[in-house]
């Protein structure tokens, strides 16, 4: 494949070396004549183990060359990869001036070409950037239509400095965000020899995946550091703690708890977060990430309330009251907190929870229900169908399988608010569904 790479910094130079090593013809493009001279001499413009050998090989076999001539590189290639930097502005926003400049250059050249060209954004950009910035510039400068006259895709990179060659050759996954299937097909062909799953998604999803991965990595580092600081303050080696924590691949390092949805609750998590952050504060150990957990959890309850409030209807069915399905435990259930807010704002609320109904009469939580939340428990209704029929808004609060079946057959005319991820789309033309995070 003939590929032009715009930007010969860290990402661009690594991609150039790895692509030529796999037999592709690559033209490296940069405004810096110094970088171009280095590339054409087979020298790496960055420090990265193994890269210079790949560049030397590419120059020697004629598959790699560098140029400052944007137009010539575009005309001589079928795919253009944008790998320019996206530096932070003073306010923290993303600087897109380099991407905008490259897109203008590409667009002007496309105006005079008849071959279909595919533009691939490898630079890290926020969701909506390709749709709202890249494509409009390309279309305006070329006079052509994206997805029809030329292709557009996003291909986020997951290269780590000092291990970039290995990361390119052995990725955990290859993410392709495609505007049109033809562009996705081209990138899939480019990467199909790599032993990694190829995941094709809409462009905005691919953009968000990249940021989510990076922020998750930053979160893990910060979490481990804060745990380590608290551990040291209580006379424990934080490394020993985290070594054991990381051995749990069922809960700690897994997909469990990693699905967007409603707030956490129950008798353990809220209590233990508060206890540990209190101890940290008493020892003068700063733990801003851990300190933020309860505030963030509270914010998710408020988000759910605002979803309901936005629909200007007063009859609400809350399906689920315990903090999770399969239990009658109401201690610190975020659904109880949500119910309290709805009651306080004058909503007509009916609640259905099979396990809590049982507990109300027989269970160990009977005293808790009657003493702590009698005003909420009085709204419990044992007739699920009646609860649904009386409501304008149906809130799916926990993952009881009864509610999944209901979600798939949502009554026409009802507004369904899904807090747990049962529904992907409305079940009829008149049923409406909205998820808390989707």
Swiss-Prot record:
Q: Name one GO molecular function term.
A: NAD binding
Q: Which reaction does it catalyse?
A: GDP-alpha-D-mannose + 2 NAD(+) + H2O = GDP-alpha-D-mannuronate + 2 NADH + 3 H(+)
UniProt entry tagged with the keyword Repressor: no
Q: Catalytic residues per the record?
A: 268
User: Which EC number(s) does UniProt give?
Assistant: 1.1.1.132
Please give the pathway this protein is involved in.
Glycan biosynthesis; alginate biosynthesis
**Which Gene3D superfamilies does the record associate with it?**
1.20.5.170, NAD(P)-binding Rossmann-like Domain
Query: What GO biological process, any one, is recorded here?
Result: alginic acid biosynthetic process
| InterPro entries given in the database record | 6-PGluconate_DH-like_C_sf, GDPman_DH, NAD(P)-bd_dom_sf, UDP-Glc/GDP-Man, UDP-Glc/GDP-Man_DH_C, UDP-Glc/GDP-Man_DH_C_sf, UDP-Glc/GDP-Man_DH_dimer, UDP-Glc/GDP-Man_DH_N
Keyword annotations from UniProtKB, A to Z: Alginate biosynthesis, NAD, Oxidoreductase
Do you know which Pfam families this protein is assigned to? Answer: UDPG_MGDP_dh, UDPG_MGDP_dh_C, UDPG_MGDP_dh_N
Entry binding sites for GDP-alpha-D-mannuronate: 161, 210, 214, 217, 225, 256-257, 259, 262, 265, 324
Q: Where does NAD(+) bind?
A: 10-11, 30, 35, 86, 124, 271, 331
The family this protein is said to belong to: Belongs to the UDP-glucose/GDP-mannose dehydrogenase family.
Per the entry, what this protein does is: Catalyzes the oxidation of guanosine diphospho-D-mannose (GDP-D-mannose) to GDP-D-mannuronic acid, a precursor for alginate polymerization. The alginate layer causes a mucoid phenotype and provides a protective barrier against host immune defenses and antibiotics.
Kindly provide the name given to this protein in its UniProt entry: GDP-mannose 6-dehydrogenase
């Amino acid at each position: 494949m003939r590929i032009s790479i715009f930007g010969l910094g860290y990402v661009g130079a690594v991609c150039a070396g790895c692509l030529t090593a796999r037999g592709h013809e690559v033209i490296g493009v940069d405004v810096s004549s110094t970088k171009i001279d280095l590339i054409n001499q087979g020298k790496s413009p960055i420090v990265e183990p193994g890269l210079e050998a790949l560049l030397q090989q590419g120059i020697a076999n004629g598959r790699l060359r560098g140029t400052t001539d944007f137009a010539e590189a575009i005309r001589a290639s079928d795919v253009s990869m944008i790998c320019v930097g996206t530096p932070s502005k003073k306010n923290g926003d993303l600087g897109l001036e380099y991407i905008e400049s490259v897109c203008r250059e590409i667009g002007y050249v496309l105006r005079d070409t008849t071959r279909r060209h595919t533009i691939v954004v490898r630079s890290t950009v926020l969701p909506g950037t390709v749709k709202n910035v890249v494509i409009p510039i390309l279309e305006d400068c070329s006079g052509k239509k994206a997805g029809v006259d030329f292709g557009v895709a996003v291909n986020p990179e997951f290269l780590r400095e000092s291990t970039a060659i290995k990361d390119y050759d052995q990725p955990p996954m290859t993410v392709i965000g495609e505007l049109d299937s033809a562009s996705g097909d081209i990138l899939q062909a480019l990467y199909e020899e790599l032993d990694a799953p190829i995941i094709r998604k809409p462009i905005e999803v691919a953009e968000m995946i990249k940021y989510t991965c990076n922020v998750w990595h930053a979160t893990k580092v910060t979490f481990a550091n804060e745990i380590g600081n608290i551990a040291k303050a209580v006379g424990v080696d934080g490394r020993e703690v985290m070594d054991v924590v990381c051995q749990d691949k069922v809960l700690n390092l897994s997909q469990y708890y990693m699905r967007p949805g409603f707030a956490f609750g129950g008798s353990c998590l809220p209590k233990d977060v508060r206890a540990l952050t209190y101890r940290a504060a008493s020892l003068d150990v700063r733990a801003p990430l851990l300190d933020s957990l309860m505030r963030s959890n509270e914010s998710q309850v408020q988000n759910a309330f605002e979803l309901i409030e936005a629909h200007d209807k007063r009859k609400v069915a809350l399906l689920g009251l315990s903090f999770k399905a399969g239990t009658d435990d109401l201690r610190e259930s975020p659904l109880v907190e949500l119910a309290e807010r709805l009651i306080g704002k004058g909503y007509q609320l009916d609640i259905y929870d099979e396990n809590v109904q049982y507990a109300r009469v027989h269970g160990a939580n009977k005293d808790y229900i009657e003493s702590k939340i009698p005003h909420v428990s009085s709204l419990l209704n044992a007739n699920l169908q009646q609860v649904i029929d009386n409501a304008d808004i149906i809130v799916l609060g926990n993952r009881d399988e009864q509610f999944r079946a209901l979600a798939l057959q949502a009554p026409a005319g009802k507004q369904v608010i899904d807090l747990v991820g049962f529904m992907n789309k409305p079940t009829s033309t008149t049923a409406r569904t909205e998820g808390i995070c989707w």
